[in-house]
């Protein structure tokens, strides 16, 4: 089932697609990120932020797209800002890896494997610290770094099946 977009907006060159509540929360989170030195990574590697049933980034698209599930975007604006940064970093890792692949898709491990997830969580933690997210949120991200395989498989049909199980 595809969500019908009732609204669209462009913030700092990033297209936002979704309902009015989603767009407002996304604007709020992007505004928080805008003041940070790390925002350029977000702006350079995400072209679209789209309301969806579950969260994940499609870094391989011509316009890299962060699909965002309601549990993520309806959480606090600070948490959502951290999630945007996290998935933008996956897109950055994909882009960096693709530069070395002469036009073919890079190995999924380079941008979605456990080592890549640790890098994205570290970037998310950095952003959340810059936003004074609080000890509880920072501790949660640090806990995720201990076992960065929670997102499931990253290759083949199993990857898609694991994505469909996401609640976030």
Describe the role of every protein-language-model region.
Residues 2-64, 73:
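Auxiliary, metal-adjacent structural segments of Zn-dependent hydrolase domains
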Residues 17-24, 115, 155, 159:
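Alpha-helix boundary/N-cap detector
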Residues 34-38, 93-97, 125-133:
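Sec-exported extracytoplasmic/periplasmic mature domains
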Residues 39-46, 101, 132-142:
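Surface-exposed patches in mature extracellular/periplasmic domains of secreted proteins
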Residues 67-83:
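Short pre-active-site segment immediately N-terminal to the catalytic Zn-binding motif
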Residues 77-79, 94-126:
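Post-HEXXH active-site segment of zinc metalloproteases
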Residues 82-95:
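Active-site recognition of the HExxH zinc-binding catalytic motif
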Residues 130-168:
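Long, well-structured alpha-helical subdomains associated
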């Amino acid at each position: 089932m595809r969500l019908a977009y009732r609204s669209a907006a462009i913030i700092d060159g990033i297209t936002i697609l979704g309902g009015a509540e989603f767009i407002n929360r996304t604007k709020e989170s992007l505004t928080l990120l805008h003041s940070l030195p790390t925002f350029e990574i977000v702006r350079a590697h995400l072209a679209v932020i789209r309301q969806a049933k579950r969260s994940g980034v499609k870094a391989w698209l011509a316009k890299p797209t962060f699909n965002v599930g309601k549990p993520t975007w309806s959480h606090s604006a600070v948490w959502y800002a951290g999630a945007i940064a996290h998935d933008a970093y996956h897109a950055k890792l994909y882009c960096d890896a693709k530069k070395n692949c002469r036009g073919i898709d890079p190995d999924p491990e380079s941008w979605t494997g456990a080592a890549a997830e640790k890098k994205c969580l570290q970037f998310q933690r950095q952003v959340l610290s810059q936003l004074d997210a609080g000890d509880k949120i920072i501790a949660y991200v640090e806990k995720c770094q201990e076992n960065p395989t929670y997102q499931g498989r990253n290759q083949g049909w199993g990857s898609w099946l694991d994505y469909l199980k996401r609640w976030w």
